[in-house]
Amino acid sequence: MARRVLIMGAAGRDFHNFNTVYRDDPETQVVAFTATQIPFINDRRYPASLAGALYPDGIQIYDESELVRLIREFAVDDVVFSYSDVSHEYVMHEASTVMAAGANFVLLGPNATMLQPTVPTVAVTAVRTGVGKSQTTRAVAGALKDAGKRVVAVRHPMP
């Protein structure tokens, strides 16, 4: 029987983690995403066109305030924490909540989630949301194009 997984996130790393680890894994079933930080994202679906063949209806996105109810309702085995810009205190509070509700609390490491480039790569990262990664990426891409390089930008999907 497939492990039932819920992914917590903020419309970023959560979708990346899904695509790199769970999307094509028949031994897991991602039953839901939860989200916070992004206005009006709850009650939407991660689209079937991005979710892949195992998820023909896409995956529902719920407000994170429903986490405990969702763990129980969907008999979740593992909750994957997929934020990258929150405090240690917040992470551990969520871990306690998840485990008290009966699920495992999972943090995916870089070896499981990093893309494996076959060409020279530049990564634009930041310590929190909204600090200018997109603008910086455009500037770096422009400079590389001006230097005669072929440039491709890779970004996680947004529903």
Where are the model-predicted features located?
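A solvent-exposed beta-alpha-beta segment
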Residues: 2-76
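Phosphate-bearing ligand-interacting subdomains
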Residues: 48-111
